[in-house]
Amino acid sequence: MPLTVRAGHAPYRLPLSNYWWLLLGRHSLRHVHSYLRLHKGLRIPLPWPEQECLHLHPKPYKCLLRYPCITRQPHLLQGWPTKSSLWFDPKPYHPSADSKLLPLGLITLSACSTRVSATTRWSSFHATDPSLSWLTGSSPWLVILQGQGGSLFCHDVLQGRLYILSHSVSLFLKTGLRHCEAIYRAPLWRDRPLPSLWTCRDPDKAFLPTLLARSARRGLAAFYALWRLHLGSRSELSHPVLEWESTELVLTDWRRGRNEAQRDAPSVAEHFARCRPLLDELCGEGGWLPFAFLSTSPHVWLILTEGGPVLAVDVNDTSVWRIADDLELLRRLGSLLLLSGLRLPLRPPSGSGEAAGEPGYEEEERRGRASTASATAATSTRGPTRPTRVTRKGRVATGGVHLSARPESEEQTDGHHGRQESSDDHQRGGSGRGHRDDGAHRHANDKTEPQQRGEHEERKQTDSGRHEHAQESQVARRDEEETEQGDSERSCGGATQTYGGRGRHDSCPSIPLSVPGPDPRLWVPPPHLLFPSPLPPMTPVDDEPSVRPRCPPGPAEEPPTCRPRPPRPSSDTPLSAVSRPSAPPVPPPSTARVRFFLSSSSSSPSYSPAPLSPPSPVSPSSPRSPFIPPIRSPGLRAKPRVSSGHPAAFPPAPSSAPARSERVTSVPSSASPSASCVGKSQPPAAHTA
């Protein structure tokens, strides 16, 4: 007589489950059917997953006929047992089948059970229907059938498919539903081991970040749907180097405050109101989602962007920095930048003038508004920069340094060559702040001594203002076009600006929010992505050169002259005996706008023509000063560009003139006749005459 499991013996069901499966597999199908009638409704735990059970029933299809969503689709009823029969016909699914199958019972996936009501009017099921399993995305009903030789089959009712599970019950006791094709068919869990999916309790700390990272690949919409289900959950973020250093991420919606198991969430609605303008500029409006904060530092929030990178924001001082390329990389490797910085004070030390209420803030703000060269500290790599914040007047500032409305290329030019400009001030008679600070110096003189000038000087300044706007607008347009083409001028120079300027360049490099090219190291975010600023309006440029009113020139400021070329050394002259001529003086900005760059690809500075902006009306035969070329990748060479409507800057030299020497990466060790001319360009014969 078969063993009957009564209600009082519920703790013994799991050990006896193997007996029931072996009992079903080692008897004829006629005896198995008698056992099903005797133990109708008994739940036998599956070998895997243990959370699911087989509901023994002699006629499981009779229970499914009451759902209109199945009966209205005749193709789903193929092979079903008739009212007077018990057997399932597999020929509509496998034409080579020679025997019928006996239904053993029904498996209802735990999250669904029987949620589809009898009044359902759906004609078909889709992966987004709420009746489908939230674990697998497949049908919530699976019917287990047994063949003549003991093989087990699985019938996916709502999909109308038949799969083989195993060729014997003994093999099924080892694998369970691991090889059930109806479950493996779901695309969301194709690359995830299935045992971790069957969790009826709260997701564990290791499984939840994996689930979130997989959904983040499909964008913010897929991540948001799963993130809303697990608000208040905690997951551990381990340190990639120090195993004992770890912190917890608390999934929280900052807009809902402390409701729904979010008691540890800080009230940060007013803080995010300050961060919103900065995040909208960096990621775009609607392209970022704050999803968690750190349990050890509740003021640090993690933000997922539309492109995939993960940002961290400190809501106290409104500083933003990038911590990982995507959420899965953050889960696997942790974040050295995030976790190692938790021991340090994230807020600046007292006395640094960071807080808006501290003394010296207004004076610092006025100083940053008056000086147009103050962005040097924001892009310089000589020391750590200060965190970014949004000032009370709505401007984005890096520490106490306010970003001016000039294009990014001019700001980074000042940052690259702050030392060079200060050393050349004695040649130009400047005030010691560089030639680009003449505008600020001029404005200061306008405020202090307007009576010393005359009406003629004011009219002169008004006329030159229009030319300045036209020049700056053209420079800004050209710099944006060069930046969007993927130039690596600023990324190779070591002055790349971090998001919010947090940390040094070697510890937190600037990587764009969305990497468009195959090599992200050669791409620099355009200025409108970092901190966009309105450009001055376009005005027509006259043919006459623009006159920039300046302070009275000093005695050392003289117009540039064409210096004669030093004689070429002979072959027997040693390299050390040849004195290299110094670089000619830089012309004042009133003659032509000059762009300075420091080349890092060669040991000796190489000279090549660079475009002027705007094109000056100087004739082609007049001498031009050599320019240091912009920084480019090692495999690229800059070509001299010519403005449309103007002749070439360097006309072709006659055949008698020597050819230009190519630019090399290092000075040759042996003394050669052209060793002293490495990197020099031979001027045309018309110039030397």
UniProtKB/Swiss-Prot annotation:
It comes from the Viruses. Residues 347-689 are annotated as: Disordered. Residues 515-539, 550-569, 611-620 have a biased composition (Pro residues). Residues 405-480 have a biased composition (Basic and acidic residues). Residues 347-359, 370-388, 570-581, 591-610, 666-676 have a biased composition (Low complexity). Disulfide bonds: none annotated. DR1 gene is not required for propagation in cell culture. Loss of a part of the DR region may occur in viruses propagated on cell cultures. This is Uncharacterized protein DR1.
